[in-house]
Amino acid sequence: MGFSQFGSAVSKGVLAKSPINEASGLVASRENPGFLWTHNDSGDESRIFLIDTLAQMRAIYYLEGVEARDWEEIAWLQADGTNYLIIGDIGDNRAVRPDITIHIIPEPHFSAIVDSIAAAIIDTIPATSIQTYKLHYEDGPRDAEAMFYDPQKEQLYIITKRELQVGLYGVKIPQESSEILLLKRKATLPFTFITAADISPNGDEILIKNLLCVYYWQRKSGESMEHTLSREATRQPYQPEPQGEAIAFRIDGGGYYTLSEQLLGLQAHLFFAPHNQPNPIK
């Protein structure tokens, strides 16, 4: 598996008395550097949370007119100079959904919250600002919890969860089509029970995790995602968390965060693992 690119993770804070009790997605904010977006698993309202790097709640945003069936992942994309968030309603435990859904919203920008954590801002993303796509797997329904957007190839990738060897699926977004978009199988990966993934801001590094391990790839220049992930991964230091389903690169690529659920009375920590190569993203 090779040497470790990241050091051991340390706790940066605890989600104390927080409505985030089943964190199931994490991504670094581009509009608000030093902050992270997350959301709950199925059963919650249609909302996303902004936390700082000490796990303190800063803002809650509701998505008007959107159903939260089984939100599992959140990702980032930039188009025409605008930062967007992609919310993945991609969970399907029984693999019965004929299609899954993603919602794309302009990333909210804040200024007043930086100096105060007295109370979280609460606001709403209007329905007119939400772009929704329905997606369909080319080979039938799948359960998935891992999703990221590749800025180099302008592709959204979803990694399935429950197979003994999971699938990597891709689709180009954004698109103007109102039809259900086809998720094409790009590769089969020798992992199982994948719960989260992220890509570095420049698209050169990829992280994938399950409940026990974090895996890392360094992408070669011009390489497709399927070729990158078909190479052997390097396994990173990781202390398993209670139902750990969230991972995100820091905005400068200098490490990654993980966030877990509050499970069986255990606290949910925000962990940070530093990159052994300082500031690798140029």
Q: Residues of each region from the PLM?
A:
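Sequence/structural signature of beta-propeller domains
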Residues: G2-K282
